[in-house]
Amino acid sequence: MQFQLFEAEQAFAGQVEEFIAQHWLDVAEPRRRLSAWLNAAGSESLRQQWYRSVVEVGWSVPHWPIEYGGCDWTRKQLHIWLSACLKYQTPAVLTFATAHVGPLLIEHGNAQQRALLQRMATFEESWCLGWADRRVATDSYGVNTRILRTPREISISGTKTRVIDGMTAAWMMCVTGGEGNEPNENRSSIVLLPLDQKGVKRDPKAALSTGRAMAEIVLNNALAASWATLDVPLDELRRRLTGLAANDLSALADSAALTEQVRQLKDRVAADPNMEFGLLRDCDALAIEASGLLGMEQRAITQGELPLPAVRLRAQTLWGKLSELQIAAFGYYAMPFVDSALADNEGAVDNTRPVGEMDMTMVMRRMLSPAIATELGVDLHDSLAQEVLGLPVQDE
């Protein structure tokens, strides 16, 4: 029986490789594919061509239930598909909409909200997360955005900052504070907000190193439908975003991406005669650790021997090591540019420096922090600590 299962998985892996070769590797030369993977300007048509192919074959949301467009795949098949996409650096098949918004709507949404799933599954509408507010500390969950409810609609006012993909998203999962002039305590809401409307103003901000643009979005009486409030506690949303959900297997494919990026880094280092030999040795060591991570992923998926957060924490550690190697090899140019990394509520290490002088030690620590690495501003360590210590949930 195990041998038959292995044969079936091998056959499926071959099918996936053939599909990616036909619809991605053979349709454009490497430089164009890299531009599309990095979301560079001028690569939209190539990305859309890939997405159309994925939708046509029915693999756009394989982790969703079948009745919403998902596939009747095993956990191993899902891992094979996601790993191959990461290995060959295709445009992301796990978007914020398909990885986070869709599953939440399937589990907690009403009929009107679930009607939004179809355009998510076809990649026709992208989504963003509006959580951080302007003038709120980088690592604070406080929300100043206000809402006003009427029987027909919801009006939202506030400013969302560090919104990834906010310049192009059609919808926002918007975290709001209290209603009207009421205090925020225990009043947080999650509202599904269409962004193509008069009350929304978007300003571009610095992009992440992956090429994903960020935005600051001003909401001035932006309107959402009366049914648009998602009945999910804010703490549950935080759990989902940090990867604590026990049934979320969609993100357990980091080993493939790590292995490929370590290989590319090693090739770049080996081609430069001025690089230190020690960097090559460190690349080899990290490649071995990435192979170990693959084993952890497979054990968590097929045997259930490892809790998913343990695998994600290990992946987070290895991504940090890769970042350190990239910075060691290429210095400043390997650092992700995130403006929020320049802000730190602990202040400078050396308080004798003039006010406003950049403390690069502090900046480096912020750049490599898990909160920056996750791109959504949430950290798995924080959520785990909250659970273990029994800290109260703070939704304000």
Show the residue positions of the predicted features:
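A structural signal for short hydrophobic beta-strand segments in well-ordered beta-sheet cores
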Residues: T145-L148
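Internal helix-loop-helix
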Residues: Q48-F123, D165-W171, A290, L294-A300, ...
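Glycine-rich beta->alpha junctions and the first turn(s) of the following alpha-helix
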Residues: Q2-L5, K201-L293, P370
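C-terminal helix-coil-helix/basic helical segment that borders enzyme active sites and/or dimer interfaces
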Residues: A28-A40, N274-L280, A287-D350
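A short core secondary-structure module
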Residues: E153, S157-K201
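Glycine-rich phosphate/cofactor-binding loops in nucleotide/flavin-utilizing enzymes
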Residues: Q2, I80, F330-E396
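A short, Trp-centered hydrophobic/proline-enriched beta-strand micro-motif
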Residues: F123-A132, V175
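Amphipathic, small/basic residue-rich leader segments at the start of a protein or domain
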Residues: M1-T95, L116, V338-G347, N351, ...
